[in-house]
């Protein structure tokens, strides 16, 4: 990953530089959406125990929910600040986890290690940065065990968040208030094609109603 991209995420997770909107977003994710995403992933994977990996774990709250349920959790992020945030979350919740500094496109993990590999709020940032997100999905598949479940959650096109983003964009307020200036909102067919290009089979893509349709979920089993 480009050094500029790494620096951008380190700034985002620097508590001294975090914008008001970024703080609000993190609060909402921590309070509500991490629980929604955890339930959705458990539902589509039908997993009761095992190893879970989140490349692009951010603040680590969703991984924390899985650790609370007894799963063996590995969190990976490009940003050292994000990993420090995750470690503090796990320490505060008295949870065990593994933490890896790494790039989704060159994951420093051996093949076929996990029962579930997921991320949320990650794959929408690559196309506008001239990166092919399917290469990241391919890496996620590589570290997933056979018959394991791959899950990707992204902001949906024409979701409530999409219209808020467009408002900020029209009035040139993204740089000042929005945490991500290169955020993408995906159509169903775009997420499907991203996963298909990476080699996924029997893909399911749908809007996640429990997120108030803010998010879209794509998932498949590794065959």
Predicted regions: what is each one?
Residues 73, 150-151:
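A short hydrophobic/small-residue beta-strand
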Residues 151-171:
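Conserved class I S-adenosyl-L-methionine
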Residues 198-200, 207-223:
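Core SAM-dependent methyltransferase catalytic element
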Residues 118-131:
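A short SAM/SAH-binding and catalytic strip from SAM-dependent methyltransferases
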Residues 134-146:
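A short glycine-rich, Lys/Arg-flanked "PGG" loop and its adjoining helix->strand segment in the class I
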């Amino acid at each position: 990953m480009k050094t500029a991209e790494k620096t951008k995420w380190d700034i985002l997770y620097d508590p001294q530089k975090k914008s008001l909107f970024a703080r609000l977003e993190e609060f909402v994710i921590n309070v509500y959406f991490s629980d929604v995403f955890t339930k959705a992933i458990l539902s589509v994977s039908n997993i009761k125990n095992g190893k879970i990996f989140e490349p692009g774990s951010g603040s680590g709250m969703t991984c924390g929910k899985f650790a609370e349920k007894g799963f063996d959790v590995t969190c990976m992020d490009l940003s050292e600040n994000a990993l420090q945030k995750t470690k503090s979350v796990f320490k505060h919740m008295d949870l065990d986890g593994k933490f890896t500094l790494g790039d989704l496109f060159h994951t420093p993990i051996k093949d076929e290690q996990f029962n579930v590999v997921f991320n949320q709020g990650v794959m929408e940032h690559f196309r506008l940065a001239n990166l092919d997100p399917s290469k990241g999905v391919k890496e996620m598949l590589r570290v997933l065990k056979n018959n394991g479940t791959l899950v990707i959650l992204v902001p949906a096109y024409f979701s409530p968040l999409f219209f808020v983003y467009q408002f900020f964009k029209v009035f040139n307020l993204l740089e000042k208030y929005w945490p991500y200036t290169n955020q993408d909102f995906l159509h169903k067919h775009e997420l499907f094609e991203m996963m298909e290009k990476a080699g996924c089979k029997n893909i399911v893509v749908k809007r996640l109603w429990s997120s108030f349709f803010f998010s879209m979920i794509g998932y498949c089993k590794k065959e």
